UniProtKB/Swiss-Prot annotation:
Biological processes annotated in GO: negative regulation of DNA-templated DNA replication initiation; regulation of DNA-templated transcription
Gene3D superfamilies given in the database record: Met repressor-like, Replication modulator SeqA, C-terminal DNA-binding domain
Species for this entry: Pseudoalteromonas translucida (strain TAC 125)
Protein name per its UniProtKB record: Negative modulator of initiation of replication
NCBIfam families (alphabetical): PRK11187.1
Role: Negative regulator of replication initiation, which contributes to regulation of DNA replication and ensures that replication initiation occurs exactly once per chromosome per cell cycle. Binds to pairs of hemimethylated GATC sequences in the oriC region, thus preventing assembly of replication proteins and re-initiation at newly replicated origins. Repression is relieved when the region becomes fully methylated.
Main location: cytoplasm
Length: 197
């Protein structure tokens, strides 16, 4: 195994270029450096106590062992490049930043903010997401407060939208799932987003 130490600034740059949660440092660097995928390796990146990162690369298997895996990659690569052309919340969400959010409400607002940044023009569709007796989203704090009691409205960061946060985690997950679906994500993607909470 090989290890490299990188400074905090470089680590932040690599992390900010993450396109999907769980993407390896090796994959990100290959994309940034425009390297071909002939010798794809995954890296394990660990943050040490002094905020220095250590990257561990596994041994490269012989070329004969790589061939079957590489034969299966082209369709996945083509599919991924098609997705990258479209606005995608997975390009904006950063796992490290998500983990730093304070509690469930913090993560909830962070994910909604990522949806807003990705889909500013279509985000208005979330206003149609409602409960049986409750309004979940509004364009003003007053609209939420007037729609029911105990709403605890919070502003979705950098947007004119407000969301009701006085609900349990299961309800918040359902709301994220509905937001993803109304913005055009597949059921599988919506479930993945829901599980980030």
């Amino acid at each position: 195994m090989k290890q490299i130490d990188i400074d905090d600034e470089l680590y932040q740059y690599i992390a900010s270029n993450t396109q999907s949660i769980g993407e390896s440092a090796s994959t990100i660097l290959r994309r940034l450096l425009n390297l071909s995928g002939e010798k794809i390796q995954t890296a394990n990146v660990e943050l040490n106590q002094n905020n220095q990162t250590t990257t561990t690369l596994p041994k490269v298997p012989p070329v004969a062992e790589q061939t079957p895996a590489l034969a299966a990659k082209p369709s996945a690569v083509a599919e991924k490049s098609v997705q990258q052309k479209n606005a995608n919340v997975f390009n904006v969400l950063n796992k490290e930043e998500l983990a730093m959010q304070k509690g469930v409400v913090g993560r909830f607002l962070f994910i909604l903010s990522a949806f807003y940044r990705t889909h500013k023009t279509d985000f208005r569709a979330v206003l149609d997401i409602k409960g049986r007796d409750r309004v979940y989203f509004a364009t003003s704090k007053e609209d939420l407060v007037n729609s029911g009691s105990s709403m605890n409205p919070k502003n979705i960061t950098d947007s004119e939208y407000w969301v009701m946060t006085n609900s349990n985690t299961t309800r918040k997950k359902m709301m994220l799932h509905e937001v993803a679906l109304c913005l055009g994500y597949s059921t599988e993607q919506a479930e993945k987003i829901r599980d980030y909470l």
